[in-house]
Swiss-Prot record:
The lineage of its organism: Viruses, Riboviria, Orthornavirae, Kitrinoviricota, Alsuviricetes. It comes from the Viruses. It catalyses: RNA(n) + a ribonucleoside 5'-triphosphate = RNA(n+1) + diphosphate; ATP + H2O = ADP + phosphate + H(+). Residues 1475-1501 have a biased composition (Basic and acidic residues). RNA-dependent RNA polymerase replicates the viral genome composed of 2 RNA segments, RNA1 and RNA2. This is Methyltransferase/helicase/RNA-directed RNA polymerase. SUPFAM superfamilies: DNA/RNA polymerases, P-loop containing nucleoside triphosphate hydrolases. Residues 1475-1518, 1621-1649, 1678-1704 are annotated as: Disordered. Residues 52-295 form the Alphavirus-like MT domain. It is found in: Host cytoplasm. Belongs to the ssRNA positive-strand viruses RNA-directed RNA polymerase family.
C-alpha cells in the first residue's frame, strides 16, 4: 500500500516537473535584463507564467516594461492569421513584426497615431535600429514618412477617429489613454471595427487618491489641475464639449465650475502625471476623466445605432486587458471594481478642524488592519493611561515593522509618514473618547429604562437611533447626533459598482446581501437532522373526503373550444406592453397554442375551501409522498415565487403563460409531467384548462382555489363570453375543506364569512384581530390594501397594493383602506373583494373606513341615513337613482364608416377654421420682443438655421399644432425674451396679506394640512433616495449663499402643442428654467408632503396628476355623480406666469410654514422668488424679478395651489373641484356664483388672465365633462394626429401605439355613440362628422395609415431676406452682443435707421414650407402687426373688415385712428338720439321695464332668441366686460350681443348685472351646419345654461313670436345674407353648445357684395337690429312704436312673410 502511494507521488512530481519545463520553454522573452526584484514581481503577477531576461541593459521602469512586452505578445498572437488589422498608436517595432518583415503574418495592416514630440523622437530612434533596417523597402519608406509626421498608406498621423481604413479588428498597446470614448466610437464607425483588444495601465489608487508611489508594482502618479486658456477651447459656441469631448465624464458640479471659469477666460481640467517608480525619464500626461472612463464605463451608447461594450478581461498589477466590442444599444451592463482587497479605510483628520491655514487634508487614507489594532488597544486600556498619548504612540510605532515567522509574513509593515502617524493616532484617540461616551450614555439609559416605567426597546430605539442609521431620531446626548456620527467615524472603502450608461459618476456601494435560508432537498440529510432533533417536520394535514362529479356537460366544453380565438385575442392585446420580457412570453404562448384542437376534459380534480385552509399545502404533501414530477401553475409571479419555496425538485412552478411552453416541450421530449396543478384556478378561464389538457393529454389536472374569491377578470375586453372555471365545478372530483388555519377567530365568526362558508371553524391562535382605525392611521409594519387603482395611487407612499393583487398572499398585518367611492361600493357589493381583503392577515387587520360600509357588510346590517330635523318615517328603497337609469339608456348609434385622413382633415378645417395660406409647421417672428427688465443676447448665435428639415405630415400646411425645437436657437431666444422679460403686477403688502388670508381660509375648507411624523419621515427618505438614484452626490450640494447658485440654465422644450384653431400668428415656445440641485434638494421633501396632501387630504377636491386620461376620467365621473344637479365651470389661465405675484409667493410660503418647513428653507424659497439670472447657453441671459420659473421643484405644486386658491375664493357654491396646474374644473349644485370683489386682484384676473367656460359640457385636461359622463376629447386627439409632423418612422410607430392604447374602448357601440354626441354638442357640429373623425382616430391607432404615405414637408424654414433686413451687415459684424434695456422711446444705437421702417420682403408671402415671419427688432416697443396674415375663415368680424394696406408711415396711422374715433362718436350720438325718441313714447314704468329687460336680454341672463355674428370657434371665452372692437366700420359691432347696451348706464348695469354677467355677455354663437339633438331626452334635457346662475331653479318663461318682428328680423337676415330666405324651424330643436346664454343660429357664408352696400342700408339694418332686440320678448304696445316699425319696413327692401324660429 505504501509503495503504491509512493509511486503515485512520484508520478505527480514528474508531471509537475514536465509542466514547469514547458512553462520555462515558453517563457516570455524580455529584450532587457530585469533586476531580480522586478523579475520576482513579474513572476508573482503572472503566475504560473515565467519570464526570461535578455542581454540589453534594464530600463528605468522594468516592471512597466515587462507589462508592455506581455501585452505585445498577446496582441500579436491575436492578430496573426487575420487578413486586415488596425493598430491604434503603433510603434515601428510592433508594425515591423506584424507587417513590415518579409514573412510578416498580416497582409493588410494600418497604424493610426496622433503625431507628437514624444512619438516623433521614438519613431526616429526606431528608424535607425537594426530591426527596422531589415524590413521591406515599402515599409521602410512609410516608416521614414511617419518619423517626419507625414501620413502614408501604412500610417496616418491625425488620430484613430479621422481615418477610414476598413478592418473588423484592432489592437492597442498602451495607446488609448488620450483617445476619448467619443473618438473611439467614431473609429468603430469609420473603420467598420467590431472588436478592439487593448492593454493599458490602470492603477487602482486612481479611484480614490491623488498622489501615489507604489514601489512594489513600480509606478507613481500625481493628479493635478491643468490650467487652460479660453483660446484653447473656443468657448464662444457655448459648449465646451464641442471641442473637448473628454469633458463628457465630469459630474454636473465640476461642469458648472468649468463653464464659469471658461466664461471668465480660463478653466482647468484634471490631468494625471504617470511614470515609473524611480524613473528619471519623461513622464506621461493624460486626461484624468478620459483615462478613468475605460475602467468605469461598461456600455457606452453611440449615435450610430450601436454601443461600445468595454470589458476588463484580465488584471495583472497595474496592467489590465480590455476587450472593446460593438454591441446592440440599450442593454444595461454592470461591473464591480473591488476596493476591499487593498484593506484601506478613511478616518477623519482632527487637525483639519483645528487648522486655520487650510493646509490639512480632511481625511487620512491608511490601513484598515492597523486602525483596528489601535482601536482595540485603546478599548482595553484605562482612560488615565491614554491621556498623555505616549503609550499610544509607542504602540503605533511598534506596528510599523513587519513580523516574519518561519519565512512567513504574519504581519505586514505599515507604510506611513511620521506626520500622518501622529495625526492618525490623535484622530483615533478622539474617536475612542466619543465611543466611550456613547457606551456610558447607552448603559445609563438602559438602567433608567429597566428600573423605570418606560419601555426598554422604545428608549433604546431613541438612544441608538442615529447610530443604527434610523432617520429623524435623536438620542439623549450630543454624541448620538447625526452630525457627530457622520463626521467622527472610520469610513471603510467598499466596492464600486460600475452601472454607467451616460455618466460614470453614477456609482455606489454594494448593498448588503442577506444570506438565504438553507433549503434541504436531500432526504438522507433530512433524516439525519430529524434523528438529531434539529429538524421538525410539520405533520401532514388530514385530507377531506372526495365528492364524486355530478354529470358531464358536453355543451360547456364545446363552448370552451369555440372560445379559443377569444383567448388568442386576449394574448395578442397584451402584446402592446412595453415590458420586453412579458412581450416575449406572450409571443411564445401564442406560438404554443397555434394549431391546437381542444377536446372535453374528463377526470378533473379540485381542492376548494376557505382562505388559509391548507389546500395547496395538503396537495403538495400528497404529491411528494406519491412521487413523480408535477408542474404548479400560478397566475402571478409573486405566487410562483412563493410556490418555489414550498416544492422540491423535480417538480417546478411557472406562471400561466410560461407553463404552456414548458408543457409542450416536456410532451415533445417524451417526459410529460405526471400532474399539473393550477393554483387559484378561478382566476383562469376554462379554455386554459382545455389548452393544458391538449398540450399534455396524459397529465392529471388538479384545480386549487376558492369559488368565493376574486375570479377571472377580462382586462383586455376581448373575452366577455368565455366559459369560466366556476362553470365546471360540479364535473370535478372535489375535496372541500371547511377549516382554516390562517384566518383569526373574529374573522371566521362574522356573519359575512359564515354566510359564505357555513359551519367553518379555525385553528388560528389569534382571537381578536380586527380594529377600526382613523382615516389617517399609518403603520409601517402593515401592508396596505385598497379596492381600486385610484386609492392605490393615492397611497403609493405606503406601498399599497390592490386586493386583487394580494389574492393568494399572506401578511402578518394588513390595513384595509376604503374611502366610499362609487367604484369601491360596487366592488364591496360583489363580496369577493371584501373576502380577500379580510383574509390576508394572520395577526392584525386595521380597517380604515370612515363610512362604516365594511362593518355593516361584515355584520349584514343595512345602511340607513336618519334626518333628525325632518319628522318623517324612515323608508328604505332599493330603486336605483334616476342618474343611473339615464346613464344606462342607449343612444342613437351611427353606422361605422371607413374614414381617410383627407376626409378627417376636411371636416376639421370646415368646423374649426382653415388658414388656406398657412403652409408651415411652425410660425415665428424674426424680431425679438422685450417687455421690460434687462436682457443680453448674442446676435450671431441667434441667427436662425435656414436649412430645410424634412418631416412627414398628413397635410402640406399644418394647421393646428405649434412646433418648437430646442435646437433652434432663434426660437429659444425668442421664447426667453418673450416669457421672461415680462413683469408681474405686485400688490401692496397689506393687500397681498389680506388676499392670502382669504385664500387660506378657502383652502382650509377643503384640505386638512396636518402632517404626521410618518409622512414627514417618508418624504425625507424618498427625497434622499430619488436624489441618489439620479446620480446626486454630496459634492453637488452648494451652500445657499454661493453666488453661482443664483444662475439658472434656460432651455426650451421640444414639443408640438395643439391648438383648436389655425395658428397664423407668431408663437413662442415653453421654456424650462433648470434650478440647481442644491435649491431643489432643500425644499424637495416639503414639496412631496404638499403634493401628498393635495392628493389625499381632501374629499371634495381632486389633484389630477400622475394618472392616465382614462383612469382620470373614471375618477372624475365617480365624484361628479355624487353632486346632484351638477353645473360646471371650466377655467384656464392666460399668461399664468405673470399672474403669479407677491400674493402667490406669500401664499405658498404660508403653506410651507403650516406643514412644518424649517424657517431657513422658507426664506430660501422667498429669496429664489426675487432677482435671479436666466442663462441660455450661447444665446443670452435675462434678469428675472418675481416671475415664476418652470423648472423649480416647487413650480407644479405651487401652480396648482395658487390656481385652486384663486378659484375656490372667487367662486361660491363649489361642491367638487379638480385642478392640475392652471387648469380648473368647478362643479356646483344648481349654480355657481362669482364674486371678483373677494380678492384685490379679482378684477385683474377676471379681465386679463381667466378664461372661463360655463355650460353643460366643459373641457378639462383633454377631457369633456358633463353631469352624466366624462370622456376623452376625440377632437383634440384628431387635431394632434392630423396636425403634427413626424420626424421618423420609429417615433411615428410609437405614437400609433399610444393612440391605440387610448382608443381601445372606442369600438364599443355605446361609448362610440357617447363620444359622438358629446363631441358634437361641445364643438357644435353634426354627430355624423364627429363619428367620422373618431373613426379616423381609431384607424390611425390600428396602423391603417402607413408612414410612407405621409407627405414630406419642410419644418420651420426661415426666409433669408427677413434676417438680412432685420440685422444689417455692419451691425452684425460690429455688435456681437446687444443689451436690451427696459422699454424706452428711442431705439438703441445702431438700429435706428433699420428699425424705423420695417419692411416685409417679397419672400415672406405665404407659401408651402416657409413660416410666417415679420421683420422687426425689439427696441422696447411692441412689434407691428403683420399686414399679410390672412384672417380665419370663420371669423365674421374680420371678414366684414375691409383689408387695409400696410404702411410704415406713423402719420397715416394717426390719421386713420382719428377718423375711427370721430366715426365712433358720431355713431354713439345717433344711437343715443334714437333711443331717447323711442323712450319718450313709452310710459315711465314701461320705459324702465323695457330698458332693464333689454339689458338683461343682451347680457344673456333672460332667455330668448338673439342674433349673433358667427365667429371662429373658440374653446373658451374671457371675463372681459368690453366688446371686441373691429378695425373698421362693421355691422358686427352693432349686432353682436357682446356689445354693451347703449341704454344701460353704469349704475343700471351695476344694479342689473348678475354674478356671471361679466363673462356671459362676451360670448358669440358658433356657425353650425345642422344642430343635432340625441334621442334620449331624459339624459340630455336642459343643455343650455339655466338662468339658475342667480339661484333661480324654475323653468324658462316661454317666449312668443311676433309676426311683424319676425318680418323685420328676416329683413335683416336677407340684407346680410341675400341667398338665405328663411331660418329652419328645426333649429329650435337643436342640441346647441352655448357659452353663457348666447344662442346658436345657423348661417351660411356671408355674401361677397355685402360690404359694398350704401350707408343708408347699413343704417336701416342697424336700426332694425335695435328694434328687433327691443321687441323679440315684448310685443309692440303703442301705435307710435308700430309706426316706427312700419317706417323702417318701408325704407328696406321687400321682405317675404316668413316666420323666425328661436333656438332652444
Amino acid at each position: 500500500m505504501y509503495a503504491k502511494a509512493t509511486d503515485v507521488a512520484r508520478v505527480y512530481a514528474a508531471a509537475d516537473v514536465a509542466y514547469a519545463n514547458v512553462l520555462q520553454q515558453r517563457a516570455v522573452k524580455l529584450d532587457f535584463a530585469p533586476p531580480l526584484k522586478a523579475l520576482e514581481t513579474l513572476h508573482r503577477l503572472y503566475y504560473p507564467l515565467r519570464f526570461k531576461g535578455g542581454t540589453l541593459p534594464p530600463t528605468q521602469h522594468p516592471i512597466l516594461a515587462g507589462h508592455q512586452r506581455v501585452a505585445e505578445e498577446v496582441l500579436h498572437n491575436f492578430a496573426r492569421g487575420r487578413s486586415t488589422v488596425l493598430e491604434i498608436g503603433p510603434s515601428l517595432h510592433s508594425a515591423l513584426k506584424l507587417h513590415g518583415a518579409p514573412n510578416a503574418p498580416v497582409a493588410d495592416y494600418h497604424g493610426c497615431t496622433k503625431y507628437g514630440t514624444r512619438d516623433g523622437s521614438r519613431h526616429i530612434t526606431a528608424l535607425e535600429s537594426r530591426s527596422v533596417a531589415t524590413g521591406r523597402p515599402e515599409f521602410k519608406a512609410d516608416a521614414s514618412l511617419l518619423a517626419n509626421g507625414i501620413a502614408s498608406r501604412t500610417f496616418c498621423v491625425d488620430g484613430v477617429g479621422s481615418c477610414a481604413f476598413k478592418s473588423r479588428v484592432g489592437i492597442a498597446n498602451h495607446s488609448l489613454y488620450d483617445v476619448t470614448l467619443e473618438e473611439l466610437a467614431n473609429a468603430f464607425e469609420n473603420h467598420g471595427l467590431h472588436m478592439v483588444r487593448a492593454f493599458m495601465h490602470m492603477p487602482e489608487e486612481l479611484l480614490y487618491m491623488d498622489n501615489v508611489v507604489n514601489a512594489e508594482l513600480g509606478y507613481r502618479f500625481h493628479v493635478i489641475e491643468e490650467p487652460m486658456a479660453v483660446k484653447d477651447c473656443a468657448f464662444q459656441g457655448g459648449d465646451l464639449r464641442l471641442h473637448f469631448p473628454e469633458l463628457d465624464f465630469i459630474n454636473e458640479s465640476q461642469e458648472r465650475r468649468i463653464e464659469r471659469l471658461a466664461a471668465r477666460g480660463s478653466y482647468s481640467r484634471r490631468a494625471v502625471i504617470f511614470s515609473g517608480d524611480d524613473d528619471w525619464g519623461d513622464a506621461y500626461l493624460h486626461d484624468f476623466h478620459t483615462w478613468l472612463a475605460y475602467l468605469l464605463v461598461r456600455n457606452y451608447p453611440t449615435p450610430f445605432g450601436f454601443s461600445l461594450h468595454i470589458e476588463v478581461q484580465r488584471r495583472h498589477g497595474s496592467s489590465i486587458e480590455l476587450r472593446i466590442t460593438r454591441a446592440p444599444p440599450g442593454d444595461r451592463m454592470l461591473a464591480v471594481v473591488p476596493r476591499t482587497s487593498q484593506g484601506l479605510c478613511r478616518i477623519p483628520n482632527i487637525f483639519y478642524y483645528a487648522d486655520a491655514s487650510g493646509t490639512e487634508h480632511k481625511t487620512i487614507l491608511t490601513s484598515q488592519h492597523k486602525v483596528n489594532m489601535l482601536l482595540n488597544f485603546m478599548q482595553t486600556r484605562p482612560e488615565k493611561e491614554l491621556v498623555d498619548m505616549t503609550v499610544l504612540m509607542s504602540f503605533a510605532r511598534a506596528r510599523l515593522r513587519a513580523i516574519v515567522v518561519a519565512s512567513e509574513v504574519t504581519e505586514s509593515s505599515w507604510n506611513i509618514s511620521p506626520a500622518d502617524l501622529v495625526r492618525t493616532v490623535v484622530s483615533l484617540y478622539v474617536l475612542h473618547i466619543i465611543e466611550r461616551r456613547r457606551a456610558a450614555v447607552a448603559v445609563k439609559t438602559a438602567k433608567d429604562d429597566v428600573f423605570g416605567e418606560t419601555s426598554f426597546w422604545e428608549s433604546l430605539k431613541h438612544v441608538l437611533g442615529s447610530c443604527c442609521g434610523l432617520r429623524n431620531l435623536k438620542g439623549t446626548d450630543v454624541v448620538f447626533t447625526k452630525r457627530v456620527v457622520d463626521k467622527y467615524r472610520v469610513h471603510s472603502l467598499g466596492d464600486i459598482i460600475c452601472d454607467v450608461r451616460l455618466s460614470p459618476e453614477q456609482v455606489g456601494f454594494l448593498p448588503s446581501r442577506v444570506p438565504p435560508a438553507r433549503v434541504f432537498h436531500d432526504r438522507e440529510e433530512l433524516e439525519v437532522l430529524r434523528e438529531a432533533g434539529c429538524y421538525n417536520e410539520r405533520p401532514v394535514p388530514s385530507t377531506p373526503p372526495v365528492e364524486e362529479p355530478q354529470g358531464f356537460d358536453a355543451d360547456l366544453w364545446h363552448a370552451t373550444a369555440a372560445s379559443l380565438p377569444e383567448y388568442r385575442a386576449t394574448l395578442q392585446a397584451g402584446l402592446n406592453t412595453d415590458v420586453k420580457q412579458l412581450k416575449i412570453t406572450l409571443e411564445n404562448a401564442l406560438k404554443t397554442i397555434d394549431g391546437l384542437t381542444l377536446s372535453p376534459v374528463r377526470g378533473l380534480e379540485m381542492y376548494e375551501g376557505p382562505p388559509g385552509s391548507g389546500k395547496t399545502g395538503t396537495l403538495i404533501a400528497a404529491l411528494e409522498a406519491a412521487g413523480g414530477k408535477a408542474l404548479y401553475v400560478a397566475p402571478t409571479r409573486e405566487l410562483r415565487e412563493a410556490m418555489d419555496r414550498r416544492i422540491k425538485p423535480p417538480s417546478a412552478s411557472r406562471t400561466q403563460h410560461v407553463a404552456l411552453a414548458i408543457l409542450r416541450r416536456a410532451t415533445a421530449e417524451g417526459a410529460p409531467f405526471a400532474t399539473v396543478v393550477i393554483d387559484e384556478c378561478f382566476m383562469f378561464p376554462l379554455v386554459y384548462v382545455a389548452i393544458v389538457h391538449a398540450l399534455s393529454p396524459s397529465s392529471r389536472i388538479v384545480l386549487v382555489g376558492d369559488v368565493h374569491q376574486i375570479g377571472f377578470i377580462d382586462f383586455q375586453g376581448t373575452s366577455a363570453n368565455m366559459p369560466l372555471v366556476r362553470d365546471v365545478v360540479k364535473q370535478c372530483r372535489r375535496r372541500t375543506f371547511n377549516q382554516t388555519k390562517r384566518c383569526p377567530a373574529d374573522v371566521v365568526a362574522t356573519t359575512f364569512f359564515q354566510s359564505l362558508y357555513p359551519g367553518c371553524t379555525t385553528t388560528s391562535g389569534c382571537v381578536a384581530s380586527i380594529s377600526h382605525v382613523a382615516p389617517d392611521y399609518r403603520n409601517s409594519q402593515a401592508q396596505t390594501l385598497c379596492f381600486t387603482q385610484e386609492e392605490k395611487s393615492r397611497h403609493g407612499a405606503e406601498g399599497a397594493m390592490t386586493v386583487h393583487e394580494a389574492q393568494g398572499r399572506t401578511f402578518a398585518s394588513v390595513i384595509l383602506h376604503y374611502n366610499g367611492s362609487t367604484a369601491e361600493q360596487k366592488l364591496l357589493a360583489e363580496k369577493s373583494h371584501l373576502l380577500v381583503g379580510i383574509t390576508r392577515h394572520t395577526n392584525h387587520l386595521y380597517i380604515r373606513d370612515p363610512t362604516g360600509d365594511i362593518e355593516r357588510q361584515l355584520n349584514h346590517s343595512a345602511k340607513a341615513e336618519v334626518f333628525t330635523d325632518i319628522p318623517a318615517p324612515l323608508e328604505i328603497t332599493t330603486v336605483k337613482p334616476s342618474e343611473e337609469v339615464q346613464r344606462n339608456e342607449v343612444m342613437a348609434t351611427i353606422p361605422p364608416q371607413s374614414p381617410t385622413p383627407h376626409g378627417a382633415i376636411h371636416l376639421l378645417r370646415k368646423n374649426f377654421g382653415d388658414q388656406p395660406d398657412c403652409g408651415c409647421v411652425a410660425l415665428a417672428k424674426t424680431g425679438y420682443e422685450v417687455f421690460g427688465g434687462r436682457a443680453k443676447i448674442n446676435v450671431e448665435l441667434a441667427e436662425p438655421d435656414a436649412t430645410p428639415k424634412p418631416h412627414r405630415a398628413f397635410q402640406e400646411g399644418v394647421q393646428w399644432v405649434k412646433v418648437t425645437n430646442a435646437s433652434n436657437k432663434h426660437q429659444a431666444l425668442q421664447t426667453l425674451l418673450s416669457r421672461y422679460t415680462k413683469r408681474s403686477a405686485d400688490l401692496p403688502l397689506h393687500e397681498a396679506k389680506e388676499d392670502v388670508k382669504r385664500m387660506l381660509n378657502s383652502l382650509d375648507r377643503h384640505w386638512d394640512w396636518t402632517v404626521t411624523e410618518d409622512a414627514r419621515d417618508r418624504a425625507v427618505f424618498e427625497t434622499q433616495l430619488k436624489f441618489t438614484q439620479r446620480g446626486g452626490t454630496v459634492e453637488d450640494l452648494l451652500e445657499p449663499d454661493d453666488p453661482y447658485i443664483r444662475d439658472i440654465d434656460f432651455l426650451m422644450k421640444t414639443q408640438q402643442k395643439v391648438s383648436p384653431k389655425p395658428i397664423n400668428t407668431g408663437k413662442v415656445g415653453q421654456g424650462i428654467a433648470a434650478h440647481s440641485k442644491s435649491l431643489n434638494f432643500v425644499l424637495a421633501a416639503w414639496i412631496r408632503i404638499l403634493e401628498e396632501i393635495l392628493r389625499t387630504g381632501s374629499r371634495t377636491v381632486r389633484y389630477s396628476n400622475g394618472l392616465p386620461d382614462e383612469e382620470e376620467a373614471m375618477l372624475l365621473e365617480a365624484k361628479i355623480n355624487q353632486v346632484p344637479h351638477a353645473t360646471f365651470v371650466s377655467a384656464d389661465w392666460t399668461e399664468f406666469d405673470t399672474a403669479h405675484n407677491n400674493t402667490s409667493e406669500l401664499l405658498f410660503a404660508a403653506l410651507l410654514e403650516r406643514i412644518g418647513t424649517p424657517a431657513a428653507a422658507v426664506n430660501l424659497f422667498r429669496e429664489r422668488c426675487g432677482k435671479r439670472t436666466l442663462r441660455a447657453k450661447g444665446l443670452g441671459s435675462v434678469e428675472v424679478d418675481g416671475l415664476l420659473d418652470s423648472g423649480a421643484a416647487w413650480t407644479p405644486c405651487r401652480n396648482t395651489i395658487f390656481s385652486a386658491a384663486v378659484m375656490l375664493t372667487l367662486f361660491r357654491g363649489v361642491k367638487f373641484a379638480a385642478f392640475k396646474g392652471d387648469d380648473s374644473l368647478l362643479c356646483g349644485s344648481h349654480y355657481l356664483r362669482f364674486d371678483a370683489s373677494r380678492l384685490h386682484m379679482g378684477e385683474r384676473y377676471k379681465t386679463k388672465h381667466l378664461k372661463v367656460e360655463v355650460q353643460k359640457i366643459v373641457p378639462y385636461i383633454g377631457l369633456l365633462v358633463s353631469a352624466e359622463q366624462v370622456v376623452l376629447d376625440p377632437v383634440r386627439s384628431a387635431l394632434k394626429i392630423f396636425g403634427r409632423c413626424y420626424t421618423s418612422e420609429l417615433l411615428y410607430s410609437k405614437y400609433v401605439e399610444a393612440v391605440r392604447d387610448i382608443t381601445k374602448g372606442w369600438s364599443d357601440a355605446r361609448y362610440h355613440s357617447l363620444l359622438c354626441h358629446m363631441s358634437a354638442c361641445y364643438y357644435n357640429y353634426a354627430p355624423e362628422s364627429a363619428a367620422y373623425i373618431i373613426d379616423a382616430v381609431v384607424r390611425f391607432g390600428r396602423g391603417d395609415f402607413p408612414f410612407e404615405q405621409l407627405r414630406v414637408v419642410r419644418a420651420h424654414v426661415q426666409a433669408p431676406d427677413a434676417y438680412s433686413s432685420t440685422y444689417p451687415a455692419n451691425v452684425r459684424a460690429s455688435c456681437l452682443d446687444h443689451v436690451f434695456e427696459p422699454r424706452q422711446a428711442a431705439a438703441p444705437a445702431g438700429f435706428v435707421a433699420t428699425c424705423a421702417k420695417p419692411e416685409t420682403p417679397s419672400s415672406l408671402t405665404a407659401k408651402a414650407g416657409v413660416s410666417a415671419t415679420t421683420s422687426h427688432v425689439a427696441t422696447g416697443t411692441a412689434p407691428p402687426e403683420s399686414p399679410w396674415d390672412a384672417p380665419a375663415a370663420n371669423s365674421f368680424s374680420e371678414l366684414l373688415t375691409p383689408e387695409t394696406p400696410s404702411t410704415s408711415s406713423s402719420a397715416v396711422i394717426v390719421f386713420i385712428g382719428l377718423l375711427y374715433i370721430v366715426w365712433k362718436v358720431a355713431q354713439w350720438w345717433r344711437h343715443r338720439k334714437r333711443t331717447e325718441d323711442l323712450n319718450s313714447r313709452k310710459p315711465p314704468s314701461q320705459d324702465r321695464q323695457s330698458r332693464s329687460s333689454e339689458c338683461l336680454d343682451r347680457s344673456g341672463e333672460r332667455t330668448g332668441s338673439s342674433l349673433t355674428a358667427p365667429t371662429a370657434p373658440s374653446p373658451s371665452f374671457s371675463f372681459s366686460e368690453r366688446a371686441r372692437l373691429a378695425t373698421g366700420p362693421t355691422v358686427a359691432a352693432a349686432t353682436s350681443p357682446s356689445a354693451t347696451p347703449s341704454c344701460a348706464t353704469d349704475q343700471v348695469a351695476a344694479r342689473t348685472t348678475p354674478d356671471f354677467a361679466p363673462f356671459l355677455g362676451s360670448q358669440s354663437a358658433r356657425a353650425v351646419s345642422k344642430p343635432y339633438r340625441p334621442p334620449t331626452t331624459a339624459r340630455w334635457k336642459e343643455v343650455t345654461p339655466l338662468h339658475a346662475w342667480k339661484g333661480v331653479t324654475g323653468d324658462r318663461p316661454e317666449v312668443r313670436e311676433d309676426p311683424e318682428t319676425a318680418a323685420v328680423v328676416q329683413a335683416l337676415i336677407s340684407g346680410r345674407y341675400p341667398q338665405k330666405t328663411k331660418l329652419s324651424s328645426d333649429a329650435s330643436k337643436g342640441y346647441s353648445r352655448t357659452k353663457g346664454c348666447s344662442q346658436s343660429t345657423s348661417f351660411p357664408a356671408p355674401s361677397a357684395d355685402y360690404q359694398a352696400r350704401d350707408c343708408q342700408t347699413v343704417r336701416v339694418c342697424r336700426a332694425a337690429a335695435e328694434m328687433a332686440r327691443s321687441c323679440i320678448h315684448e310685443p309692440l304696445a303703442s301705435s307710435a312704436a308700430s309706426a316706427d316699425l312700419k317706417r323702417i319696413r318701408s325704407t328696406s327692401d321687400s321682405v317675404p312673410d316668413v316666420k323666425i324660429s328661436k333656438s332652444a
